[in-house]
Amino acid sequence: MFSHLRNRLSVNRPQALSSQIRAASTMKEAIVSRGPRVHIIDSPIPKAGPGQVVVKIEYAGSNPKDWKRPEYWGSKATMNQGDDHSGTVYEVGEGVSDFKIGDRVAAMHEGKQPGGSYAEYGVSWAYTTIHLPEQTTFQEGAAIPFAAFTAACALYAKLDLPYPRHPVSDDQKIPLVIWGASSAVGSYAVQLAKKSNIHPLICIAGRAQEHVERMIDGSKGDIVIDYRKGHEAVAQKIKANLSGQKLEYAFDAVSEMGSYQTICDVLDQEIGKITLIIPAQSYSDIPKTIKKSVTTVASVHEDLKEFARGFSTYFGRGLQDGWLKAHPQEVVPGDWRG
């Protein structure tokens, strides 16, 4: 389950259990601890509280934080760490009107709470649950919520870029650097930025550059730069693609190994904004004149609940209309034991 899958999101499929187990109102659930180690236990099938949805899970998506949290925090983070899943609605809680039993959905579970995705049934809030059209498979669906919500938070809540419903006019250029554009979070950021008509997109990637090339629009100045060329070469290529324009916005979906330092060398030192994704770092070496922020998807459960609800609807429509594409997946065999 936790093997490193470069530029692909790992998904796992729970194996069906007997009707006797289901009738007993229990399920199998995977508990992740330091190592990482996975222990399969029997747990009660969760109940939907007010505003919640319980999903019978077909696929669960794995994210790097699923093993990092137990590794860093030990017993405090020993729990069902899964936060991405897809399947059919099993139960809806009080006040939920957008979903009904049997609906095909993808959902993001609230981290550090019971009812995680590494189980036969998982819990999500209605505002982080996405309707899946028939053309989107459950496997694809499990690769969407966590990364897509993170990308939306970065671009619109942190960088305050124009929303897709109010796209930039064709005669206006807003350069945006996306470092880690071939990652799951990065590739959803690219797709969202395009819907906002934000160009040129200056995408930084490595071996998966072809994946990024297929998403961007070269006719609008979009480009992919290989970070393996080194700090100076990347900085020079970013500058060259700006054509003399100031760089105001950057999303660093990697936030390590010199990525944000390279970006900050090119960002405008007076109006530049950068958002990063590793909350444990201080980023104290970023110049104080540059506005920095850290994007955490947990913010959708705090002051961005309606923001998340709006994007849940938008993502569902994007899948239906065909412009939103799931990040490439790799299915790990052996259900949660994989």
From Swiss-Prot:
Tell me the first and last residues of the signal peptide. none
List the EC numbers from the record: 1.-.-.-
Residues that, per the record, bind substrate: A147, A148, F149, T150, A151, A152, C153
Q: Which residues bind NADP(+) per the record?
A: 65-68, 182-185, 205-208, 227, 277-278
What conditions trigger expression of this protein?
Answer: Expression is induced in presence of sodium nitrate, and repressed by glutamine.
Q: Which InterPro entries match?
A: ADH-like_N, GroES-like_sf, NAD(P)-bd_dom_sf, PKS_ER, Trans-enoyl_RdTase-like
Taken from the UniProt record, the cysteine pairs bridged by disulfide bonds within this chain are none
Top-level taxonomic group: Eukaryota
Query: Which of UniProt's keywords are assigned here?
Result: NADP, Nucleotide-binding, Oxidoreductase
Disruption-associated phenotype: Leads to an enriched product formation.
Pfam entry (one): ADH_N
GO MF annotation: an example? oxidoreductase activity, acting on NAD(P)H
Q: Does the keyword NADP apply?
A: yes
The function of this protein is:
Trans-enoyl reductase; part of the gene cluster that mediates the biosynthesis of fusarubins, highly pigmented naphthoquinones responsible for the coloration of the fruiting bodies. The non-reducing polyketide synthase FSR1 is responsible for the condensation of seven acetyl-CoA units to yield a haptaketide. After rings A and B are formed by aldol-type cyclization, the PKS-derived product is released as 6-O-demethylfusarubinaldehyde.
Similarity annotation: Belongs to the zinc-containing alcohol dehydrogenase family.
Per its record, how is this protein called by name? Trans-enoyl reductase fsr4
What species was this sequence derived from? Gibberella fujikuroi (strain CBS 195.34 / IMI 58289 / NRRL A-6831) (Bakanae and foot rot disease fungus)
What gene, per UniProt, encodes this protein? Answer: fsr4
